[in-house]
């Protein structure tokens, strides 16, 4: 379970499902609706996978152990987000499971009360009946389930504690009056457990800093991964007297505070339109110099070159002709 999940009724229903299967998954979305009705574009599921790994149910069995062994072998080196290599942390690997296991071994739950989350708020409506929370399809009112758990993914939890609502992952999410009620309920639960909440929300990620306190950025991680794949050996990359940190320091790719680069998106990039215009004018000039064929060959090359992993030539000249994977 992810730590941002809140249960509203007994998990006994989940154990009953596991009596009849060995592996239990919940899809991000479960209903066919007209294009454009969802709060996030449908093609996002091609990137992050059809099943949400905020929840996964397993029963000790041969097939579950087989799956865990298979999964473990892949997560050792391929548990991160990289659209170029079609990876999305531990989650996207689950798309393989329906091809591996029979319906008796693997159950895909269509219970609307499981894994209610921002990505499916548009298809699920919360309502109260006999002092219990239920959920039904917004387009098919006859279908309903008891609310088991809600996954409050992507919210600013400090804002929820103050009574506000900020969804950081789906920027243009619609306001649903029924969802506002369960957001308020979660905020109230945070306040009721404020000491525990404040303690854990203030903790910093143990592997987010080098031994001298400088910040490990996403750029550093991806450069390190690339250099390891090229054969570099560094037993502890967090030590400032290690090979990797020494290369970063020498090339001035070290930051002392959290990098703004990690936070930048297309939506919050400052003066994006003005900078895009300037860049496009430069590319037009380059097109006039290179001509049609060489320009578009360059554009094709820039796809793999633009990956952070391909910038290892900045650290060591020996990668000047061997930096693209």
Tell where the protein language model's regions lie, with residue ranges.
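Glycosyltransferase catalytic domains, chiefly GT-A lineage
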Residues: 1-325
